[in-house]
Curated annotation (Swiss-Prot):
Belongs to the UPF0398 family. This is UPF0398 protein ABC2016. It holds the Pfam family YpsA. Gene3D superfamilies: 3.40.50.450. The lineage of its organism: Bacteria, Bacillati, Bacillota, Bacilli, Bacillales. It comes from the Bacteria.
Length: 188
């Protein structure tokens, strides 16, 4: 529910890019814990009526959130939908071949894909437009963010604040708790 008590039908999910977290391989153990934390936060939204999860498909939290949605769709919530709305054509052009292949697979599995700008990257304004566009068209923002470590999520947060949209934070402490719980479960 948002702060007015209305259901969140569409939720924008974002956070740090992989390199901002020091993650340069999909096999990094941190990815597992980040996905598990995202899943823990998405489940209550879905159970309360969220129908669409929206991302721009950037490397890092947004793509891991897409993976979580695919998994939840397969195992527990077949009705949940994922939209990937890249800021411009060819967002992945400068990514590694492996990252491009994973991105293409995620796009193929998404329920809706459309570039916000039908042109290739031309200027930084396209990224600001993406942030404002996605925040405007969703009911709330779920963001992995640490106020002590500013980075790319700050732009989404600023847009959400300016538009009066509810912001739901995933803190580093939540991720650490997921790690502890997972290790405890493995110990048992």
């Amino acid at each position: 529910m948002n702060k007015e008590g209305r259901a969140i039908h569409s939720l924008l999910v974002t956070g740090y890019k992989a390199h901002e977290l020091g993650i340069f391989q999909e096999s990094h153990q941190g990815v597992h814990y980040l996905k598990k934390t995202i899943e823990n936060r998405l489940r209550p939204f879905i159970e309360e009526g969220t129908e669409w999860i929206i991302t721009s498909g950037q490397l890092g939290v947004e793509q891991w959130a897409a993976d979580v949605v695919f998994s939840l769709k397969e195992t527990a919530y077949p009705h949940i939908k994922l939209a990937i709305l890249p800021p411009f054509e060819g967002q992945e052009a400068n990514w590694s071949q492996a990252a491009q292949e994973r991105y293409a697979a995620r796009l193929a599995m998404a329920d809706f894909v459309e570039c916000i700008s039908k042109r290739p990257y031309e200027h930084v304004g396209q990224l600001r437009q993406k942030n404002d566009f996605l925040v405007q068209r969703t009911d709330g923002l779920l963001v992995l963010y640490d106020e002590e470590k500013q980075g790319s999520p700050l732009y989404y947060i600023a847009s959400a604040k300016a538009q009066g949209k509810p912001i739901f934070y995933i803190s580093p402490e939540e991720v650490e708790e997921t790690v502890r719980q997972d290790q405890y479960d493995d110990f048992l």
